[in-house]
Amino acid sequence: MMLLSQPGIWLLVSLFLCSSVNSISLWKSHPLVAGSNEPDQKRPDTPSSPRPLGITGAALLNYFEQNLRTMEVPDTAGVPQDSAYYTALTHYLGLCGARSENCDPGQSAVAKLTRDVPVLTRVHSHNDYWRRVPLLQALAYGVASVEADVWLENNGTTLLVGHNRVFLEPAHDLGRLYIEPITRMLQEVNCKSENKGDPYGIFYNAPEEQLLLYIDFKSLDRKLTYKLLLDYLKPLIDNNFISYYDMDAKRFVSRPVTVVLTGNYPSDEEIGVPSPRRYTFLDAPLGRLSSVGDEFTANNVSVVASSSLLELMLRCGKASNPSLTEQTAWESYGCLVEYVREAHRRDLRARIWGLPDWPVSTRENLWDMLTDMGVDYLNVDDLDAVSKF
């Protein structure tokens, strides 16, 4: 259903130009916006908080893609400028510039982006930072797990996001692309919350759902990367938005964001066991769980175990070269499912990556197979396709 006519396009332009426009909310009430003792007041639009358009999720992304040429995109300092699309969307969501002092979860970035969007709790946004709008595109599709590859740069003072070091850009800082927008979105939806011990999450219709944030260590100096990462995570820690394991109470405390380290991360032996709280959890080796003993204990060390499909196929003796087929995958079903069951016996979630993207029928048949096995996260590049799967 198209909520805006041609004049609506110019309305959006005027919002970016800081015009004061009144709009009618067609959205129903929600726990995030209910309970205020203050009378409702009409607030003027601000450059950092344009009024909601009334469309969310993938429809909102499509709207921006189709109408970007008619919008005047502000030049906002501190925002990656290689994409007018990214800048326009973050401006509309109110994620640019200073945070508004108004407490109005109904006009928050979470409401504008994820209202009425079903949460895809079994999907992981593979190479999320390659998307046209990192993080936000995944959230718009309801994806509850994203990843960022990080590199040490600027003499070990900065973590930049990217797959290959040669293509790193100064604007693609881990804080700007992930930590800061996540923190701001959670601050907005929790501004009225009296229960600071159980904050709302990043999905409007499912505030109890967690977002898994994978940090893939790429640099050789993993100890320094880890130390710097804790500095980056400080806004989430200070606002009580990040899950942790309480070493003294010996319990896992769930929060809106859970951080999982993967790639070249350091072991506890290298950095020391985090105390009194562990704020980052290690991606356990799904293919080697039976041989690692208690090294990756659920909740106090790890929450997820991961492996490529090819690695598991090799362990099952069904793949002798870098290629794999749908037929050999199905032939390995009995062996593959045991790895998933071993993870579940240890109270770990299972993620399998490295599925072929083509042909589409093969990819979707393998999605079916992994889902049937009980795999908790499908590693996905095509979010639109998996949202219709």
Swiss-Prot record:
GO terms for biological process: lipid metabolic process. InterPro entries: AIM6_PI-PLC-like_dom, HAT_RTT109-like, PLC-like_Pdiesterase_TIM-brl. GO terms for molecular function: phosphoric diester hydrolase activity. Keywords: Signal. It comes from the Eukaryota. CDD domains: PI-PLCc_GDPD_SF_unchar3. Residues 1-23 form the signal peptide. Belongs to the AIM6 family. This is Altered inheritance of mitochondria protein 6. The gene is AIM6.
